[in-house]
Regions:
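Serine/threonine-rich, low-complexity intrinsically disordered segments
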Residues: 7-9, 29, 35
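Bacterial N-terminal signal peptides
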Residues: 18-30
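Carbohydrate-interacting regions of secretory-pathway proteins
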Residues: 32-244
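N-terminal secretory signal peptides that target proteins for export/translocation
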Residues: 1-14
Length: 244
């Protein structure tokens, strides 16, 4: 007996076509190569399992997430074999967090016909208000809007990026700002390890534009993943609260 013919939504067909173009471009052109004197990223935390006390944010589903501005709605990014692909609209966690350890694995597309902020752009917003940039910045002299930067604030100390189409890791230790009344008396601080290399080492940060509305500095906040129009993927995202 013949199996019934499956049909797919226009969005699914469009998504498949875009991925096909990325794959063809990668085969025909190939990503750039790393300079010999550049530091070497590692895979030592790729696939790292969540420790005791951690909450899985992206596994097989996006049940922990909702669209921005629609807390009761379901996040609609497609998830295939544990990897979520950016679709229409940024998403945020339903829960909020103060001090934490966050593990994120991401994969940026190969877009050789694009430049700058159009090359695999997304962002991980800590507490919904501090953006850790995601971008194809492989082999570049980094600026404060490149991959691994706290957007428009901190330039990574080293370029730890892998080529596009390879899975990469962020391991983030974050301590929230401290308040006395409504006044911030201690800014938020964080350390970021990208692909096994420390790129930000215990630096103070302030809120960046474009995050979750109505989240205030010093209070608990969600994790937000940004839709910037590129097919960035995320997987194995988990978070573990830390003591103040």
């Amino acid at each position: 007996m013949l199996s019934p013919i499956r049909t797919f939504s226009p969005f699914a067909r469009s998504l498949a076509a875009r991925f096909a173009w990325v794959a063809v471009a990668a085969i025909l052109v190939g990503p750039p190569t790393r300079a010999d004197d550049s530091p070497t990223p590692s895979d030592k935390t790729l696939g790292l399992k969540p420790p005791d006390g951690a909450t899985v944010l992206i596994g097989d589903t996006l049940d922990a997430w909702s669209p921005i501005g629609a807390a009761a709605a379901k996040a609609e990014w497609p998830v295939v074999r544990g990897a979520a692909t950016v679709a229409k609209g940024s998403i945020r966690t339903k829960d909020t967090f103060a001090d934490f350890q966050l593990h994120v694995e991401f994969n940026v597309p190969y877009l050789p016909d694009q430049k700058g902020q159009a090359r695999g752009n997304s962002g991980v917003y800590l507490q919904g208000i501090y953006e850790l940039q995601v971008l194809d910045s492989y082999g570049l002299t980094l600026k404060n809007n490149d991959c691994g930067a706290i957007y428009q604030q901190i330039i990574p100390s080293v370029n730890a990026c892998k080529p596009p189409l390879q899975w990469q890791t962020y391991d983030i230790t974050f301590h929230a700002a401290r308040l006395e009344g409504d006044k911030v008396v201690k800014k938020a601080r964080l350390t970021v390890v990208q692909n096994g290399l420390t790129i930000i080492d215990d630096k103070e940060i302030t809120p960046t534009p474009g995050g979750v509305p109505d989240v205030k500095e010093g209070g608990p906040g969600p994790i937000m993943l940004q839709d910037h129009g590129n097919l960035v993927q995320f997987r194995n995202v988990w978070i573990k609260p830390l003591a103040p």
